[in-house]
From Swiss-Prot:
Residues recorded with modification Phosphoserine: 376
Record keyword Coiled coil present: yes
Name of the featured protein: Mitochondrial division protein 1
InterPro entries linked to this entry: G-protein_beta_WD-40_rep, Mt_division_protein_1, WD40/YVTN_repeat-like_dom_sf, WD40_repeat_CS, WD40_repeat_dom_sf, WD40_rpt, WD_repeat_multifunction
Entry coiled-coil feature ranges: 240-298
One of the Pfam families matching this protein, by short name: Mdv1
Cell compartment(s), UniProt: Mitochondrion outer membrane
Listed GO MF terms: ubiquitin binding
Protein species of origin: Saccharomyces cerevisiae (strain ATCC 204508 / S288c)
Other facts: Present with 3730 molecules/cell in log phase SD medium.
PANTHER family membership: ANGIO-ASSOCIATED MIGRATORY CELL PROTEIN (PTHR19857:SF8), MITOCHONDRIAL DIVISION PROTEIN 1-RELATED (PTHR19857)
CDD domains recorded: Mdv1_N, WD40
Role played: Involved in mitochondrial fission. Has a partially redundant function to CAF4 in acting as an adapter protein, binding to FIS1 on the mitochondrial outer membrane and recruiting the dynamin-like GTPase DNM1 to form mitochondrial fission complexes. Formation of these complexes is required to promote constriction and fission of the mitochondrial compartment at a late step in mitochondrial division.
Amino acid sequence: MSVNDQITHIGKTLSTTASAFLNYQKSNSNTQDVLTNNGPYKNLLSNTVNNASSTSYFYKRTEHGRFVKNASNTFEDIYSKTRRGDVFRNKFTDNKTCFRMLTYISDDLLNEIPTKEGLKSDADGKLLTEGGENENLRKNASKKETSLFQGFKSYLPIAELAIENTERLNYDTNGTSGTVGAKDVMSKTNERDEIHTELPNFQDSFLIPPGVETKKISSSYSPSALKSFSQTLVNSLEFLNIQKNSTLSEIRDIEVEVENLRQKKEKLLGKIANIEQNQLLLEDNLKQIDDRLDFLEEYGLEVIEANSDENAEDDGMSERKALKNDAIRNEGVTTESISSEASNLPPRRRQQLRDDNSLNRLGAFYSKSKKRHRKSFPTFQQLYEPGTKIGSIMSTHDDFLTCLDFDAPFGTLCTAGYLDHTVKIWDLSKQNKIGELAGHLATINCMQINRDYGTLVTGGRDAALKLWNLNLAQQLYQETQNLTSPTNHIDSPCVHTFEAHTDEVTALSLDPSFLVSGSQDRTIRQWDLRSGKCLQTIDLSFANVLTTSTNVDLSKSTLLTQRNERPSIGALQSFDAALATGTKDGVVRLWDLRSGKVIRTLKGHTDAITSLKFDSACLVTGSYDRTVRIWDLRTGLLNKFHAYSAPVLSLDLFQENAAVVVADEPSVQIYDSEKDESWSCVEQGNETSVSTVKYKENYMVEGRENGDVNIWAV
């Protein structure tokens, strides 16, 4: 197409477009249909396309989405420019004029910027002032949304400070141009991060704007100078207000992000909890299968499996026959038949028969094949903030809890209460009752769980020590709850009873192979778990040296009013051949069980010792003298001690040089001797005192005077 034809088309285009808009003003039709409904305009558009030969003409002018420069350089494409000056270079005018034309924004367009309320700026067409705002907009700045220009201006000082700090970091203070080491790069990076974090802290640099001096304000007599100062301060106030609103907006964005992260964390916590629940379920099923296999093997109830599925019905009949025959064969060893046969024997022979049966079961129970190893351990408690209450079990017993123990976080819990002769078993994950152990004739004072074998050892005021099978107890309890006729088990949950003490058992410690017990009869006994025999007895003839101290307020402690006498042996713990005991005279003694003699004595308490725990480095003791003392086992010296307002009733080792302490108060105290600080796990509104506590793997369970149990993450 020639140049004349192009000029002709331009003239037709202008006249057609003008006539279309003139007709639009007269007809008041829809704005969007002004040109599309105009016939001459559509014909002109069609002729333009036809004169271009084809639509490929337009595609020929492009390359990878951009228009390419033709030979005549009449088409200007700013994306194809390689230098800044080429953007404004053309054949029609100079660069300065082109720049002004391309960057010009009329006042009408600026006044058409919508505000937050949907209203437009003043329509008087006034130009923006030096401050960058319309005068009327400035008066209502606090009521309207901050503009992009204002926000940009408010952050200019921050950008300048960042550039200044970056240049300072990049400057080589040694004046050398050598290679910078990796450590220098890391230190500079960390320093940049610190500077970036501290950028919003303007401190004193923006309190007084430049050009305003407080001394001149108080001494000036020039109205113009004072007005100038006033205008500068007003502008600075507006600037700070914009900056404050922008910062508040950032804070709101951060709060939204934090809330989103919190919700995401809660979902992930729920996922972990679900995974660990499934792990516990699978562990329980594995344990149940192992117990069933041991039961079938022990009593010869295995049935030969069929070789094909076709004989399944016959196999079922043969299995029932085999069970019937086994029941007939073993009829003589059932509980009822044993009783009938034993009734014809002398009393001494009857007791011997029962003892032999118990010892055989004890030896078989502690065989190596019975030892259980968990495939997984819960870690969910580590995700809680320390001091968070995980859950609670209400009214486990009618009176205060005398002792409790659990095998693992979210595992199995056993509790005993005052004047309650039974042990109750609880599921810590579901927080419900799953079993019960009956057999003691008086209050149970102490207990300990062996999670490798799934056993519990208890000591009571009936002078008896009992070893329980927790798995069997749960199975029997489940059968009872399902209202099914319980299997006529030869076994009972009580595997063995250790009887030798002549007074109540006050403390015990369970080792992999041995059991050590302390009694009010002033003796310590060491038992073999596989044979049930007492290996040695240590007589504590000194236990009556200390009488009841008058320093202790007996009316304050619920335990003391119901237990009027201090225990002769308040606490003990054994590990291999080492034994630590805390007695009524307030002295801690370290024993060698191989010789049965004291190898070290730790003196410091002024009243009976109630609890103690030790590890490889330290020993922690609690006493009725209202103190907790931490001893160095290597030197035998006292490291730290901490005083409380009430007698210390129970404690457990939290970590090295730290302990979880119960001091007859509504809260559990965690005392860290290295940091010399103490913090508490307290339930708001609960004034019931804590009587006993156990801690394992950031998981703490405490029992209270009203029978409640609370579970904490620490």
